[in-house]
Amino acid sequence: MASDHPASRVQRVRHELRRRDLTVLRVDTPTPGFRRITFTGAELAGFTSASFDDHVKLFLDAADGGEPVRRDYTPRQYDAAAGTLAIEFALHGDGPAAHWATQATPGQRATIGGPRGSFIIPTDFDWHLLAGDETALPAVARRLEELPAGTRAFAVLHVAEAADRRALPSAASVQVQWVDSGAALVEAVRALDLPGGEGFAWGAGEAGTMAALRRVLVDERGLDRQAVRVSAYWKQGATAHHEHIET
């Protein structure tokens, strides 16, 4: 069991902010509602992603010829030796990034920026809670792959379509609960039988749902605010929304 206060063990690391022009190498469909696009290119040299919580900006040409569309995505897997970066796209809604991912083919060009920095959560907490919707699934999957044997983790995931509820490989001991709505996600976390010891809770998804989740974790369940990291990856009725939720 870790003895230091969580705030003293979480690391915030800054990275050189660069844009990189890349090429689509491969397009895979892990489940019907997702595309996994693998990029390559000489400009990937020096790319860094130190945390599953990281995000890069994807720049896409606007349909009206105006300013490029910008959307945030998790670096799902970076292979420095192979010179590849994989990003998974949740195909929810009809936005420009989902449309681009649906029609992407090998040889297409794309530009990414970042990550600007990393919020590094140690793996040696007594337990880890990961909660989110489809947009958080790539980050959750990456985190579970990174957790070592002997670690205990709980994942509560709002993924409405059964076909998109995939296996989540991990060396850790993982309890996964799938739910059908944001409200059900919050309720499931409220009812979750968490163990003793020092844990860390991470969540990402729709802004309103994540605000409610943070209130449950901090106000109702009594978790230390420094042991909770909740972010809005999108907001109902808004575009290009991404924020860390503090209250």
What are these regions (language model features)?
Residues 1-247:
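Extended, composition-driven regions rather than compact fold-specific motifs
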